[in-house]
Amino acid sequence: MDMDFDLINVSGLKKLIKTEIDRNVSESLDALAQKLQRLEKNSLNCSVEIYGLADTRPFFDRKVKNYYIKKICALLGLNFKAVLESETKNNYILVHLKDAATARDWQTRSCQVRLKNRDLGVEYDGPVKIFVAASRERKQLLKKTRDALLPHFKYVSLCKAGVMARRNDSSEIYIIKDERDIHKLVGQRAEASIDSSVVAISFEGDDDPAKNYSHII
């Protein structure tokens, strides 16, 4: 009788231990996933994406890639020493910089100067554009926000907290974090029309929001 009771206790104890182990493993994995997401976000905030370069050599030749990055720095008045490393993606160059402020400065200078391939010695008149790096999800949110608000908002761009939207130079700034925020703004938008001089920066011929996204400046 005592032996049966002991066996029942051992079996129950094993189940309890297994349940506790599974719970701890699950919590550890969740914590690790959250930490990785934070690290990825911080890395993107400190990086920029260079689009539009018509020369394909930088995607295969590291020296050529560095040559163009240095030339872009010279043309935009940026410090090449702020570059930690760089890598090529499907259709853009990802440049990792020393901090988020530097990444924002690269984007700002790109908007101000508006480089073209010819400025870099490439026989093509298309623009070369630089944006602060963002995850696929944030690019999708930016594209949806731009599509919904462009007729009524003069400024729509990525920001640290999500997507920033502003009707004009002096109006309130809205931060969009999900599609619900987009719907709220669409419902609240003013009747006043935005001046037709809004400039949209986009990459034509590519519907993938991970590769094609626009900033309204």
From Swiss-Prot:
User: Which superkingdom?
Assistant: Viruses
Q: Which InterPro entries match?
A: FP_N (IPR004941)
Q: What is this protein called?
A: FP protein
